[in-house]
Regions:
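N-terminal hydrophobic targeting/anchoring segments and the immediately downstream early-domain regions
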Residues: 1-23, 38
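Pocket-edge structural micro-motifs
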Residues: 6-8, 12, 103-104, 158, ...
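Active-site metal-binding loops of divalent metal-dependent hydrolases
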Residues: 8, 53-55, 235
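Short capping/connector residues at structural and topological boundaries
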Residues: 15-19, 96-98, 282, 292
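Unchanged
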Residues: 22-178, 287
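Left-handed beta-helix
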Residues: 123, 131-293
Length: 293
């Protein structure tokens, strides 16, 4: 969840407070927001951007905010016309871009798919959350989007660029492998909106023809065969090792003669000589941190 003030160009992160409800879980996003009500009342920012933490997107939030302010809408929801799962929320829009219908869990998805990014004034958010909590209402989708779409002006900002949800191991693997496609990389890592990462200038070393269509981080030593893989910093592939369709985290070592297919290793995993590890794109094999196999 983010808080953004266009006038002072600040972006600060708002984390949920303590968890509540049965089994230590919130009953909905509204209850989670209620837990940070004191923070919302104390901050100076005029506008709030609500986002989920499982979405991969390089979105020009400054454009979204300016568009929201210019429109005069009470809330702007970012959505896409690109297809997605039936379990998502879908909007129907009128000719002006106003949201006139909100549907969820539909058998045949129609309209614009909500990306769960919302822009609204801080004081309106406080008012909505306070009113919902007073009536034992905890769902942002049902009790705010659906119930108040007629009384308030909810508007859509349509984004048809790259947007991917990562909420399972399978989706993490699938979305990571999409980065091997140049068109996806160009869209996600747009030069006009750079993504900054920790610098490390140690070079990687390769045998001739050892790497095919792979993303290799700094400090890797590739002497075996690597194809359609993502290797994090400091990964070592020894001679005779054969790795394909894998995601290997920092410090992973694959010894001589080992064969890996569809594997995700956490940091500092060692795969011993001659081992064979086989996963699948629909069920990748995950090796825990620091394990030696």
């Amino acid at each position: 969840m983010k808080v953004f003030d266009l006038h002072c160009d600040t972006l600060s992160e708002l984390r949920y407070a303590e968890r509540r409800g049965d089994a230590g879980r919130f009953r909905g996003k509204v209850e989670a927001l209620g837990c940070v009500m004191d923070y919302l009342k104390d901050i100076r920012q005029d506008y709030v951007v609500l986002t989920d933490s499982d979405l991969v997107i390089n979105l020009p939030l400054d454009d979204v905010l300016r568009d929201h302010i210019a429109s005069g809408a009470d809330m702007t929801a970012v959505c896409t016309s690109l297809p997605g799962p039936e379990s998502d929320t879908y909007f129907q829009l009128d000719n002006s871009g106003r949201i006139v219908d909100v549907a969820h869990d539909v058998f045949t998805p129609e309209g614009f798919r909500c990306l769960n990014i919302f822009v609204l004034r801080r004081d309106l958010l406080i008012q909505l959350v306070t009113d919902c909590m007073a009536h034992n209402q905890y769902s942002f989708r049902h009790n705010i989007l659906q119930d108040r779409k007629d009384a308030l002006h909810f508007r859509a900002y349509v984004w048809d660029g790259y947007a991917a949800r990562i909420d399972t191991i399978e989706s993490y693997y699938r979305r990571s492998m999409e980065l091997l496609r140049p068109e996806i990389r160009m869209e996600l890592f747009a030069p006009q909106r750079p993504i900054f990462a920790k610098e490390n200038d140690s070079p990687s070393s390769y045998m001739d023809g050892s790497c095919v269509n792979s993303l290799i981080a700094d400090g890797c030593d590739i002497q075996g065969t690597v194809k359609n893989c993502i290797l994090f910093r400091g990964v070592r592939i020894e001679p005779g090792a054969d790795v394909e369709g894998c995601i290997l985290f920092k410090g992973t070592v694959v010894r001589r003669g080992a064969v890996l297919r569809g594997v995700i290793t956490d940091k500092y995993v060692t795969v011993q000589e001659g081992r064979t590890l086989m996963g699948h794109e629909n069920y990748p094999l995950v090796v825990a941190r620091g394990v030696t196999i």
